[in-house]
Amino acid sequence: MATERQPECIMSQTQHCLESLGAQSCQEPPNASGDTQQYSNNPAHNDTAGPDDHLQQITCKDRHSPVPNHSQLSIHRYQVKKLRRLQSNGSRLAGPQRGRSYLKLQSFLDYRVQQRRGTCKDGEPVWSDELEDAFHQALEANPPMGRRNWSARGESYGRNELIADYIYRLTGKRRTRTQVSSHLQVLDSFLKGDPDWERLVREQPADHSNSQTQLVGPTRRSPINCLSSSHYSKDSLVCAVQCLGFGMWVSAPNMPDRIDDAFHVYTRLRRGQPQAPMPLEELTNWRTFFPHLNSLLLEVNDPLSCEIILLEARLQLMDVHPPTGSRLEIGLELDITNPTLGAAPMSNQRENWTCYNYIYEEGQKTMETYHNIPKPHTTRIRLPFESSWWAERFTMLTEDKQVAEASGHQHAAKERNQQFFRTLTAVQEIRASEPASLRRLHNQYAGSPSDGSKRMAIILWQFRQTLPIEVGTTICRKLIAAPGRTNEIYLPTPDLDSVRLTPLSSDPIPPSRSTPSMYQSPRTHELLQQHWPLYQPSHHHVTSVFNSAGAFDFTNSITKPEESLSDKTNSASMLDPFPNLQQQTTSQPTSLDVSSGAPRMLQIPDLPLPHTGLGAYGLGHESHLIGPDEPVGSTVGMSGDAGMNGARLETLLEDDLRVTATSQGTVLQDWQQGGSKNSGKKNPRAGDDAHTLEFTQTRAFTDSGYASTKLDNYGHIQSTRDIPTEPPAGPGYASGEQPEVPQTQNFVHVDAARTVYSDTSSVTSLQREGYISELAGDLFTKVSSWQPDSMTMERISEVLPELLRAFALKVGHNAPSQMHRDVMVFIHKNRE
């Protein structure tokens, strides 16, 4: 057949369930975009097999069938267009929004391909995609005015000068009036005659329309509404995404792979009934059921700037097992279109397409996979959706239903199945990167991935089981995230040492966890991460900058004497991020004392290992890998909210090690089948989705700055994929008991991690006043250029000291040099 075959995975049906990862491979033919999982057909039940019994096989694969659907404008593109009409100098009657049909002309697309090949002195195209889009926005904002000039800022400007100025304000890159004029002439040579182009480059006749008010002049936007160059990139050009087709069906042996000829259809995309976009906040409990999306919206360094699609699938289950040799097929196809380049081939726009799949049961992650997607040659892209995992689940559900019916408890089995699908959710994240020839590494958004990859779309999945009289259908709708969500600032609750500040955004996000009281046990690092998202969360949670109540204590000068060791706070102490969770007792002590005569220095709460339930149909265990240089045989599971084992943490602190982790994890022993632990001597594989944690050793502490330390790399731990955090019990697995490590009572060397800043300084008073004046003058110049009103100025004056404090922490905390720490302390002391 002339269809694209997807990878086929052979699964057992005699035992009516699929087992864990095995040796039988899933072969993927060329030009296929499907699963790369490996499964075995080990029996799960002790069924009696006759001599004529043989394994009945189900072949699962991803199959894609395009189904046209109506395209809708995203809220992001709407906001970009809305910016063009803001801040007009005169009253203006805006007519209906006109499109840019000329952007999809083949002549224009060919011209753009040619433009990307030529570069100027800085190695970039003269008219890159960013500048090209700004150029067309400038044409919209500055209507044709013939040979007349426009007066602004006491000078006269022609239209080409206004366009050049507009481009500079929008992108931070200068293009001269001559370059703008030349570009207009080139485009006009092959776009002349197009109505949308004509209205942008030529004046309309005076009697063109008696119902429209004559245009007063170009749209001049104040700098506060102009996107700065640091925030403008191709990330602001949100791609339009629509679901072309989706289906999940079973094909009988020797039957075509089309869904219309299916033996059974679990669900398929409903056609001809497009759903209106829905605000994300109207999606019930989305933070609980889609943890990955919640983390993306709270990310500051790589903010979410893509469309979000919600697919609600109603699944019609089978009453019996399919015939031998049947195939489970899943087809998911999207259309991803660049708003500037229209229907240009995707091969010219992006490369290195990847898809991350996350499956959750009751909000707990049970599966995380990573797939490389073949490079598309059109705007259509086909995505894998874990067909092997679904085949396993469907087989188990059918078997459970048959067993319940045989025992007369079919109603209970039905309720279990319905509850399973109600709590089952999934998230798919599609990413791609620019071609190497178009990457502008020096102009990338701060904090973006080093490979230049960008999120193209986020797909959310909800599932339900159909009623007896229903058929399986899937509906697709777009979700609208509140604008400015990722830029919100959460400040600590007020106390004696803090000032209450209202959130900057008019649509605040309620935190997923209740706001901690300042009179509870300290949870200071959570305040830093949740209430101060404007700087990257530190890998080391420093407690020396907080008072005993757990709040910020920057209002008073730090003048503690160096010899007052009992008043210092240990910067290496680890705090419990989830004190409200039920704690489990262990054999290890919950605190470590410096000496019998001194106050207790290091308080480490006993943190339990999480036991995440995987539901009725959990996946098999996957092992973690330890690098060859690791002195400690432990790994960190990357599965959701979890604490750190207190006993293991104390052991690490005894060895004078500090854990540097980019996310909350679980310290547990690596398990392998056969009763042996991974000793860390071999690292046979480390996939594309491997995570790395580093250990650092504390050395050469200084006496300047807050918790200033010099950290040397000690080693690293590698972890591949997500696994259940509870090690399986039973024969074939080693015991989870850790050998007891003798407790060491001498912890005086840990006390050296604390640092008290000395108030002495070599800067004279005159120099200090000059620095303060220079900083204040620069800030005032930046703010006054925005021309804010009195209310905005009052708000800025309230927020600015706190922002300076956060900036000081970002500059000086764990800084590599003394200069950075001095800058931190200087700004902190003089920010008022």
Swiss-Prot record:
Pfam families tied to this protein: TEA
Chain intervals with Polar residues compositional bias: 24-45, 665-678
GO cellular component, one term: nucleus
Record keywords: Activator, Conidiation, Nucleus, Sporulation, Transcription, Transcription regulation
Annotated SMART domains: TEA
Signal peptide range in chain numbering: none
GO molecular function, one term: DNA-binding transcription factor activity, RNA polymerase II-specific
The organism's place on the tree of life at top rank: Eukaryota
Region (Disordered): 24-55, 561-596, 665-689, 718-740
GO biological processes: conidium formation; sporulation resulting in formation of a cellular spore
Compositionally biased intervals (Low complexity): 582-591
Gene3D superfamilies for this protein: TEA/ATTS domain
Cross-referenced InterPro entries: TEA/ATTS_dom (IPR000818), TEA/ATTS_sf (IPR038096), TEC1_TEAD_TF (IPR050937)
Reported function: Probable regulator of conidiophore development and conidium maturation.
Protein's name in the database: Conidiophore development regulator abaB
